[in-house]
Amino acid sequence: MAKKDKKPKVNTIVTKDGESLKVFEDLNDFEMFIKNETEDEEFDHIHCKLTYYPPFVLHESHDDPEKIKDTNNSHNKKFVRHLHQHVEKHLLKDIKEALHKPELKFHDKSKDETFEHIVWHYGEETEYHDRKFRIQVTVTCNHDDAMVDVDYKTIPL
C-alpha cells in the first residue's frame, strides 16, 4: 500500500508585473507556509492567495464539495455571518499565531459589498525581529458559490 503524498497543494504563478505569487487550495497548507516563511526570515515580503471552502461549509456538507448547497454564497445572510466569524475568530487568529504576533489587532478594517461579492479588508503595520512591515489580508466571497478567496500580502516599510 503506497503512502499518500502529503505535499502542499500550491501553484506558483508569475504575474504581469513579474511578481511570484503562490496560490494555495488548502487552509492548513496556507497557514503552514506563512509560519515557515516567518521562521525563515522571509516574512516581510510575501504575496500568496488561498482559494478554499470554509470549514463550516465543508462540515455542513459532510466534507463532500458536491453536496454544498447552491445557496451558500454572498447573498445568504447566514453564510456571510458565519464566514465573517470564521475570518475574525479563526483565519486572522491563525495568521497572528503563524507570525508569532498574537497581540496583532488589524485596526485597518473595511468591507465592500456589491451584488457580485463581499470583500473584507484587514491591514496592520507591525514589527518582527526589528523589521517593520505592513500586513494586508483581503477576503472575498462571491454570489455564485461558497468558495472563498484570501489574498495575503506583506510589504516591508
From Swiss-Prot:
Q: Which domain of life is it from?
A: Eukaryota
The keyword DNA repair is assigned to this record: no
Gene Ontology annotations of biological process type: energy reserve metabolic process
The record describes its membrane topology as:
Peripheral membrane protein
Q: What is its main location?
A: membrane
To which protein family does this belong?
A: Belongs to the RGI1 family.
What protein is this chain from? Respiratory growth induced protein 1
Organism from which the protein derives: Candida glabrata (strain ATCC 2001 / BCRC 20586 / JCM 3761 / NBRC 0622 / NRRL Y-65 / CBS 138) (Yeast)
